[in-house]
Regions:
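C-terminal scaffold of the Radical SAM
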Residues: 1-203
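Short amphipathic alpha-helical interaction segments
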Residues: 203-217
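Generic leucine side-chain signal with a strong bias for well-ordered alpha-helical environments
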Residues: 8, 187, 213, 221-222
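Generic detection of well-ordered alpha-helical segments
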Residues: 70, 181, 207, 237-240
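Short, amphipathic alpha-helical interaction segments positioned at domain boundaries
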Residues: 235-247
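Minor-groove-contacting beta-hairpin "wing" of winged helix-turn-helix DNA-binding domains
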Residues: 228-232
Length: 247
């Protein structure tokens, strides 16, 4: 297969560096065009959470997670994979279009099935009662410019719903919401914050963004190119924390 993608999880209970390196060696045998790697998250209320609380499993600390991530990125460099997002790596020209669509925060997408998410921009229309109804709100002046819908995760409820009446949760997003989401995703990518998109922001958001960038540039966490502000490789693992500077 010339278009294989593999998902990996590190930070498993009691996983040491040797075991993680052995898993990466096994991946190398398949030579996938793309791979994603995520640190294991203990979700509250899950079986794993109960087992960890009962000390049946011992979860690694942040220092171990950082070390395992370092092993991963070093391995990817040796194997010729581009780390184009904190958790995603690809051979040249093989970035995941599926993942990239989510991170763009502009492109609409449709989610089908239990737990699936959809996103689309609201049409720019005259703010009337009819427009409010079309946008799914009684208040056309709430500032929302986009909708995100999440189908409920209950499989039985989803399949038993009448046709066209699937149950979902809905989030209305303002320009500020979309700006914050863009910052959070862009700082995680190799492409960084696009200068053209910053220039197109509403004036208040553009001014705030440029002001918030400066300390990160001064401290060497971001660097500037002709077209973007990008997270340094060393700081990209901390991208979620860096995004807090923009809130």
């Amino acid at each position: 297969c010339d278009n294989l993608s593999i998902d990996l999880i590190y930070g498993l209970p009691d996983m040491d560096a040797a075991e993680w390196e052995a898993q990466l060696a096994e991946v190398a045998a398949y030579r996938p065009s793309h791979l994603s790697a995520y640190a294991l998250t203990v979700e509250p209320g899950s079986l794993l959470a109960r087992q960890v609380a009962a000390r049946q499993w011992r979860m690694p600390g942040q220092d171990v997670l950082a070390a395992q991530y370092g092993i991963l990125t070093d391995w990817c460099d040796r194997q010729g994979y581009e780390g184009y997002e904190v958790s995603n790596f690809a051979l040249p020209g093989r970035r995941a279009r599926h993942n990239s669509r989510y991170w763009d925060i502009r492109t609409p997408y449709l989610g089908l099935g239990p737990g699936a998410h959809s996103f689309y921009r609201l049409p720019t229309v005259k703010k009337t009662a009819d427009a409010a109804e079309a946008a799914g709100t009684e208040n056309p002046d709430d500032g929302a410019v986009a909708l995100r819908r999440a189908n409920l995760p209950d499989i039985r409820a989803y399949v038993s719903a009448p046709h066209g009446d699937s149950r979902y949760e809905q989030e209305r997003l303002t320009e500020t919401d979309l700006y914050h989401e863009y910052v959070m995703t862009a700082l995680r990518t190799a492409d960084g914050l696009d200068k053209g998109r910053i220039a197109a922001l509403p004036p208040d958001l553009r001014t705030a963004c440029l002001q918030n960038l400066q300390p990160l540039l001064t401290n060497g966490l971001l660097y500037e190119t002709e077209t973007a502000y990008r997270t340094t490789v060393a700081a990209r693992y901390r991208a979620d924390g860096l995004a807090l500077a923009f809130f």
